[in-house]
């Protein structure tokens, strides 16, 4: 289950601002400085188990399985970060394992708005939140850097016993989480 909105409510023991990150920051971090579907070599179509040709030819999964926890190698559960190699930024599990809950509201036209001059890409209007990156049940084609979906608020709260329904956690979804971002330590940046 996901503790919704928990990053913004984290105890501020370090004296820094913390938050869930916006979708574009997450995509940049997941790409590890690259501009390709994955931060490693490969084509989503080659890794995917979907499609007509998969009846005759196996998917090429050696490279993706080294970096991503997804349906083919997850054993139907999340895995520890040490199970995969890091991306060029040194980050693990940026794709797959769990979908990332983002600070943005979902807008299906988000990428067509604003053009190249967007200074604050955070979308604050809408009903559902952005989740991205696929999870341990996803096909390889759905664990790309740009893979984006949205929360299904009512469906993810069906068995929540609280009345009114909780605003803090989703009772009916597995494979979703969030990353906390915080402002950098000025002492480290000066070195």
Regions found by a protein language model. Give the residues of each.
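Structural motif
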Residues: 59-62, 171
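Short, charged, amphipathic alpha-helices and their helix-cap/turn boundaries
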Residues: 61-75
């Amino acid at each position: 289950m996901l503790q919704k909105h928990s990053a913004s409510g984290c105890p501020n023991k370090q004296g820094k601002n913390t938050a869930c990150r916006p979708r574009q920051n997450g995509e940049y971090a997941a790409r590890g400085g690259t501009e390709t579907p994955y931060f490693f070599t490969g084509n989503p179509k080659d890794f995917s188990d979907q499609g007509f040709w998969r009846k005759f030819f196996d998917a090429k999964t050696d490279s993706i399985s080294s970096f991503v926890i997804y349906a083919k190698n997850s054993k139907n559960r999340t895995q520890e970060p040490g199970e995969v190699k890091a991306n060029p930024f040194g980050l693990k599990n940026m794709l797959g394992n769990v979908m990332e809950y983002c600070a943005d509201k979902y807008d299906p036209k988000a990428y067509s708005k604003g053009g190249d001059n967007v200074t604050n890409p955070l979308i604050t209007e809408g009903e559902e939140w952005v989740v991205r990156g696929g999870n341990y049940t996803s096909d390889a084609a759905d664990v790309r850097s740009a893979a984006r979906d949205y929360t299904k608020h009512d469906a993810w709260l069906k068995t929540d016993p609280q009345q009114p329904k909780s605003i803090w956690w989703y009772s009916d979804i597995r494979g979703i989480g969030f990353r906390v971002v915080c402002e950098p330590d000025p002492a480290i940046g000066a070195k």
